[in-house]
Amino acid sequence: MAIKTYKPTSPGRRAQTCSTFEEITACKPERSLVENLKKSGGRNSNGRITSRNVGGGHKQKYRIIDFRRDKTEIPAKVATIEYDPCRSARIALLNYADGEKRYILAPLSLKVGDTVISSEQADIKPGNALPIRCIPLGTIIHNIELKIGKGAQLARSAGTFAQLMAKEGKYGQVKLPSGEVRMILMDCKATIGQVGNADHENVSIGKAGRSRWLGVRPHVRGVAMNPVDHPHGGGEGRTSGGRHPVTPWGIPTKGYKTRTNKRSTPFIVKKRTK
């Protein structure tokens, strides 16, 4: 993937950059693997806002992605590399030898015509899925399960990867994109390689309207509000908020640790650094 820049024909164009989409090989998705996607506007089932600054955006179709990689021992050929509006990574359409079709996250360097497989005896090459116990130490991996058979939950966004650091007992130690080192059961599956579209982080939105296309609404600063709306609100003229930074609900922010202890806490070998 490469980044495309524009001539400064307008203030919005001046700062804007975009993907060239040169790796995309198909315009329309596989119809059998597409669902309608209903937008929530950040509201829950009671109609109350649970995610602020969410709403609007272009209409999207949801592509059903195979995060379990549970179709084992059957090779599949990469038919297309496609754009997915619901995630930052690209997706790859697999045609299995028995005729079934599935989407997976497209790893870096995966191309049309390549063959991938989910197997304990699979080669260590991008796109193949194996249990952690079958993966050599130091291997770059992504799309990692936390619970056996639940489906991948870690290292799924564009350009991310994790690394298998050690194996001890029934757990493998995996260094995650955040810098956290975590113990994961050896029978959990992971996919070899790094997630594709690594230049996604270098794309500049360029203008407010493009954020609205993506379903992102304006984020208003607390000091610009009234006292009834935010702890930093009010005051005569411009103020600094008058206290240490807090969320709209009064919880300290900007560096304050808010993670509570959970049943999974003992599985964290080293805390995150990002």
Swiss-Prot record:
Residues 224-259 are annotated as: Disordered. Pfam families: Ribosomal_L2, Ribosomal_L2_C. GO terms for cellular component: large ribosomal subunit. Keywords: Ribonucleoprotein, Ribosomal protein, RNA-binding, rRNA-binding. InterPro entries: NA-bd_OB-fold, Rib_uL2_dom2, Ribosomal_uL2, Ribosomal_uL2_bac/org-type, Ribosomal_uL2_C, Ribosomal_uL2_CS, Ribosomal_uL2_dom3, Ribosomal_uL2_RNA-bd_dom. SUPFAM superfamilies: Nucleic acid-binding proteins (SSF50249), Translation proteins SH3-like domain (SSF50104). One of its GO terms (molecular function) is structural constituent of ribosome. One of its GO terms (biological process) is cytoplasmic translation. Gene3D superfamilies: 2.30.30.30, Nucleic acid-binding proteins, Ribosomal protein L2, domain 3. Part of the 50S ribosomal subunit. Forms a bridge to the 30S subunit in the 70S ribosome. Belongs to the universal ribosomal protein uL2 family. HAMAP family: Ribosomal_uL2_B (MF_01320_B). One of the primary rRNA binding proteins. Required for association of the 30S and 50S subunits to form the 70S ribosome, for tRNA binding and peptide bond formation. It has been suggested to have peptidyltransferase activity; this is somewhat controversial. Makes several contacts with the 16S rRNA in the 70S ribosome. This is Large ribosomal subunit protein uL2.
